[in-house]
Amino acid sequence: MEKEKISNNELKALGINEVDVLENFSRVANGLLKHNVMQKAEILANLEALIEDPVPYALKKGGKFNNLANDVIALRKKGKFVKQERSTFKLKTEIAEFPVWGLEHIETGALAQMRTAVQLPVAVAGALMPDAHQGYGLPIGGVLATTVNTIIPFAVGVDIACRMCLSIFDIPAETVDSKKEMLKGLLLDHTNFGMGGTTRTKFDTSLFDKSTWNETKVIRNLKDKAYAQLGTSGTGNHFVEWGELCLAEGALPGIPAGNYLALLSHSGSRGFGGNLADHYSKIAMTKTKLPAEAKHLAWLDLDTDEGQEYWIAMNLAGEYASANHHEIHNKIARALNFEPVMRIENHHNFAWKERLSDGTEVMVHRKGATPAGEGVLGIIPGSMSTPGFLVRGKGNAASINSASHGAGRLMSRSAAFKTLNKALIAANLVDKRITLMGSDMDEAPMAYKDIHAVMAAQENLVEVLAKFEPRIVRMADPKERPED
């Protein structure tokens, strides 16, 4: 019969995550159990009490848990091992007002979710962008400022640091027609889509030299997956595409007005970010108990281990998502034998520490929203057959310096499969001169809102600098489950 043992998972449930400390706790706990000094339940109860208040255990000379208590005290002095207590919160009784752009384009479900979000006790301000639609917790297109020491994993999004990246080449736009097969081949050779997608050869792996990959066990355990997926794209609405960029006079310093060949990509932090989001959203919902309608808006406190771990992980996922795009763009640029004259990129699923117009420091969550501070460049795509836009933020304080992250869904994926037909989609692509590789009916242009109406609704948020017309589009194969 197998002897009873205290597992590492049981110790982690108490909040023990530091590798060295975990080993010490396991050695002491299982030693006491093996020699029948204490029963398992008694050992775990003592360990939980020790973590809550290590001093009495440290002062007890010759005590069984003396060394462990000193480990905890040492970690606390370093600002670690501060557990977030399990707490129950009520929503504010009054619903704060929040500005909405393009109200006529937004479904009632998204509005209801935003109303719930601004009722959180940690909410400071909110805003809803014209591409908004219902999501989990915060609606996609929702912007929420909370107290600066709180962060909501589900308000960042499941695909942490989902982002856009645009490379502009000093090559005439008509090349997209005259060299179509060559450009199509570059996408096939240098992009890889899907949940299990990996790459064999890498362009730049320097990100993996960062010590941050050793900060927490969660990150360490995901490093190999992240490395394997470097330079890949996700599923759903993620894409890499060639198109024509029509640039206005004086829009970008050093680049004359004209029509340029450009490469645009949309994806995030892949399985690395997805696993982080799943792990920490569950912890947040365990630690922060909210009414049912708000449960996905559970937060973590940044002055606790759990909050610090998520903050570190989220920022690393941001760097990783950027590296993914750079890997794709650099490989294609090398094969094309042209360096881009400019590369522009932005997150639209992330949280930033910022200041409101009155000077209040807050945590700004943008879930499917583009940063649009004064002078900040961003990219707002349409769909596979409608234009995207290179924009410059106007710094509108009411929008919390934000704009839409795209056109936004007009219908759900299931509705698209039920109501659209392949002939209609094919005719649209022919009419717009689109070459499409991959994708399915749920990503059809008709499944999205009118990007021109969305842009018109946010003229006071961003200035349009250039229009990007997609022409050669690659997305995940139809068999792939959407990640976005």
Task: For each feature predicted by the language model, list its residue ranges.
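Domain-length cofactor-binding catalytic modules of enzymes
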Residues: 92-99, 106-110, 121-125, 136-140, ...
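Low-complexity, highly charged intrinsically disordered N-terminal segments
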Residues: 56-95, 102
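Short beta-strand-to-turn element immediately C-terminal to the catalytic PLP-Schiff-base lysine
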Residues: 143-146, 167-168, 391-392
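Short coil/turn segments at secondary-structure boundaries
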Residues: 23-26, 41-45, 198-203, 440-442, ...
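Glycine/proline-enriched, intrinsically flexible loops and inter-domain linkers
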Residues: 165-167, 322
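Charged substrate- and nucleic-acid-binding regions of tRNA-handling and nucleotidyl-transfer enzymes
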Residues: 1-75
